[in-house]
């Protein structure tokens, strides 16, 4: 039985700020990056589009996702709901725009089915935003807007575009995301001034050879379509900086991709890639490479020539080894994700290969040992995720990992943590859940910066008194162990907001628990020997969630227990010696 004991807080969403033209230009040059995947939301005023992929990894892992299609900004309509505009209202907007000689018109979220032909009179327009309407087609008259530089048509039901758009000789940005296109309209290939083309989330199956007619393209996003191959002519896009082909059906890349030497961001995640061409090594400007969720079994040695590479994501492939010295050659690499592959050993290359790495994710492999000294030069390594491997012990130099901030060793076969864990003085997050730990080292108390400690599903019978020194601790998870008591020092953890004690053998809670003034969540469920609760618990004034399922609590009146956590807290307040204080 769990209960919410607190009051809901009012929250107000701030209106998005209207971006200036200068900000929009700056944003259009930006590319995305690795990060956690998130669900795509309906674009707000900034038109942000950040959906990325299928799965998430653990909270403590380094970045694993890669998204670049998030750079559109547009003027700010009133936030919130879609406006319903009659044809007359739209015409009124068009007339107002003409009379004021405005260069920018935003008709987004108006439920527009048909754009009036009178739009042709707005020849001064440079920006036209029609996001999130119900357009199935555009009138040919849009082709009269010869000064148009930005045309944003995302989230409509377009199946084609009029040929008259080839009159838009100044058009630089075309946004066709979230429509119903089955092919790239032929007129698009004639818009040779385009620098930015968004075609995300349509039903496109092919990219034609005519893509070569768009030599000024610096951003091409065709993610989330049904594309099975790219034409060799993609290599003629020599100004391409960002290429996003994620979530398609590619099995191979054309070797001509190596001609796109200006590319800094290449997102190929969630395809069916079986290999990479050796020419990928020609991408000397490449900064981010996303290859997660493909079918790769090997990485070409030529990738070592991509010396500008900072982020490499190879999650969920069939890779068991990397070319020797590959990582040592990538002298700017700071984020490496090798999770969900077939590694049984660390990559060959010695300590130098991790000298620039800030974040390393090796989750869900078959590694049974971290080599001694492998991180001896890893002076900036802050995040290490070794979750779900086959580790039985930690290396003797474990205590020298002084730069570590987040360490995830969950779901291994560790039976002990070395005493020299005390050397990890920068550690803020330590995840040790689902191991075989029976006790914790006294040196744990030296981790004074620790904010989160997860020890769920081990075999702990007690906690060291030194845990009282972890005064910055906010989250402590001890669920599913064999604890019968807690040290009195638990009361020193005054910053604790979450305390998980479910599925243990607790017989009582120490009265010092009442000093946890910031405690918001307390989980006591499934403690079959817990017959009472201390009156001091009523002093935890911020407690909003308490779980007591399957706890006998026989020392409390049955009718109080039956009422649930809120009744119990009220009882402790009213009957205890602290009633004047709460």
Curated annotation (Swiss-Prot):
Motif position, RVxF motif: 63-66
GO biological process: cellular response to growth hormone stimulus; negative regulation of neural precursor cell proliferation; negative regulation of neuron differentiation; nerve growth factor signaling pathway; positive regulation of neuron differentiation; positive regulation of neuron projection development; positive regulation of Ras protein signal transduction; regulation of MAPK cascade
Basic and acidic residues bias spans: 1-29, 36-57
Localization (cell): Cytoplasm; Nucleus
Membrane recorded as keyword: no
Keywords, sorted A to Z: Cytoplasm, Leucine-rich repeat, Nucleus, Repeat
UniProt repeat feature LRR, residue ranges: 101-122, 124-145, 147-169, 170-191, 193-215, 216-237, 239-260, 262-283, 285-307, 308-329, 332-353, 356-377, 380-400, 403-424, 426-448, 449-470, 472-494, 495-516, 518-540, 542-563
An example Gene Ontology molecular-function term: protein phosphatase 1 binding
Keyword Amino-acid biosynthesis in annotation: no
Region of interest (Disordered), residue spans: 1-88
Gene3D superfamilies according to UniProt: Ribonuclease Inhibitor
GO cellular component terms, A-Z: cytoplasm; cytosol; nucleoplasm; nucleus; protein phosphatase type 1 complex
Main location: cytoplasm
Top-level division of the source organism's lineage: Eukaryota
Pfam families for the chain: LRR_14, LRR_8
Similarity annotation: Belongs to the SHOC2 family.
Subunit relationships: Component of the SHOC2-MRAS-PP1c (SMP) complex consisting of SHOC2, GTP-bound M-Ras/MRAS and the catalytic subunit of protein phosphatase 1 (either PPP1CA, PPP1CB or PPP1CC). SHOC2 and PP1c preferably bind M-Ras/MRAS, but they also bind K-Ras/KRAS, N-Ras/NRAS and H-Ras/HRAS; these interactions are GTP-dependent and both SHOC2 and PP1c are required to form a stable complex. Interacts with PP1c in the absence of Ras GTPases. Interacts with M-Ras/MRAS and RAF1. Interacts with ERBIN; disrupts the interaction with RAF1 and Ras, preventing the activation of the Ras signaling pathway.
Domain observations: Contains a N-terminal RVxF motif that is important for interaction with PP1c.
Role, per record: Core component of the SHOC2-MRAS-PP1c (SMP) holophosphatase complex that regulates activation of the MAPK pathway. Acts as a scaffolding protein in the SMP complex. The SMP complex specifically dephosphorylates the inhibitory phosphorylation at 'Ser-259' of RAF1 kinase, 'Ser-365' of BRAF kinase and 'Ser-214' of ARAF kinase, stimulating their kinase activities. The SMP complex enhances the dephosphorylation activity and substrate specificity of PP1c.
Protein name in UniProt: Leucine-rich repeat protein SHOC-2
Protein source organism: Mus musculus (Mouse)
């Amino acid at each position: 039985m769990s209960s919410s004991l607190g009051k809901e807080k009012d929250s107000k969403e701030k209106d998005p700020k209207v971006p200036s033209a200068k900000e929009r230009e700056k944003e259009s040059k930006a590319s995305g990056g690795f990060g956690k995947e998130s669900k795509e939301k309906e674009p707000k005023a900034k038109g942000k589009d950040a959906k990325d992929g299928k799965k998430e990894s653990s909270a403590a892992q380094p970045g694993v996702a890669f998204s670049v299609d998030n750079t559109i900004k547009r003027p700010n309509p009133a936030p919130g709901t879609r406006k319903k505009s009659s044809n007359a209202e739209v015409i009124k907007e068009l007339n107002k725009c003409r009379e004021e000689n405005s260069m920018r018109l935003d008709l987004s979220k108006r439920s527009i089915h048909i754009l009036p032909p009178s739009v042709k009179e707005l020849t001064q327009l440079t920006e036209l935003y029609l996001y999130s309407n119900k357009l199935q087609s555009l009138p040919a008259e849009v082709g009269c807007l010869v000064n148009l530089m930005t045309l944003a048509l995302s989230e409509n039901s377009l199946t084609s575009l009029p040929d008259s758009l080839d009159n838009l000789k100044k058009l630089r940005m075309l946004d066709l995301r979230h429509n119903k296109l089955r092919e790239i309209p032929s007129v698009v290939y004639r818009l040779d001034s385009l620098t930015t083309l968004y075609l995300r989330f349509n039903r496109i199956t092919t990219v034609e050879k005519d893509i070569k007619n768009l030599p000024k393209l610096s951003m091409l996003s065709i993610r989330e379509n049904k594309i099975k191959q790219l034409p060799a002519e993609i290599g003629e896009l020599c100004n391409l900086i960002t290429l996003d082909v994620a979530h398609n059906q590619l099995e191979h890349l054309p070797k001509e991709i190596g001609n796109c030497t200006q590319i800094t961001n290449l997102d190929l995640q969630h395809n069916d890639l079986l290999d990479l061409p050796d020419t990928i090594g020609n991408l000397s400007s490449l900064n981010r490479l996303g290859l997660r969720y493909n079918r790769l079994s090997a990485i070409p040695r030529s990738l070592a020539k991509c010396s500008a590479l900072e982020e490499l994501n190879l999650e969920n492939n069939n890779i068991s080894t990397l070319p020797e010295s590959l990582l040592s050659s990538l002298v700017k690499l700071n984020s490496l994700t090798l999770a969900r592959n077939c590694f049984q050993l660390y990559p060959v290359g010695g300590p130098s290969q991790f000298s620039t790495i800030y974040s390393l994710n090796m989750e869900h492999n078959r590694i049974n040992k971290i080599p001694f000294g492998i991180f001896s030069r890893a002076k900036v390594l802050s995040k290490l995720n070794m979750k779900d491997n086959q580790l039985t012990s930690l290396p003797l130099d474990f205590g020298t990992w002084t730069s570590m901030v987040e360490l995830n060793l969950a779901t291994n076969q560790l039976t002990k943590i070395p005493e020299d864990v005390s050397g990890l003085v920068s550690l803020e997050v330590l995840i040790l859940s689902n191991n075989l730990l029976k006790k914790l080292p006294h040196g744990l108390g030296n981790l004074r910066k620790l904010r989160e400690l997860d020890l769920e599903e081990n075999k702990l019978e007690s906690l060291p008194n030194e845990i009282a020194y972890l005064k910055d601790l906010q989250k402590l998870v001890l669920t599913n162990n064999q604890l019968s008591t807690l040290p009195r020092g638990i009361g020193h953890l005054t910053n604790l907001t979450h305390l998980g004690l479910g599925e243990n053998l607790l017989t009582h809670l120490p009265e010092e628990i009442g000093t946890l003034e910031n405690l918001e969540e307390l989980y006591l469920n499934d403690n079959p020997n817990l017959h009472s609760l201390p009156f001091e618990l009523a002093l935890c004034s911020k407690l909003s969630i308490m779980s007591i399922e399957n706890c006998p609590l026989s020392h409390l009146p049955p009718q109080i227990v039956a009422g649930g956590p809120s009744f119990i807290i009220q009882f402790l307040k009213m009957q205890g010696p602290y009633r004047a204080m709460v």
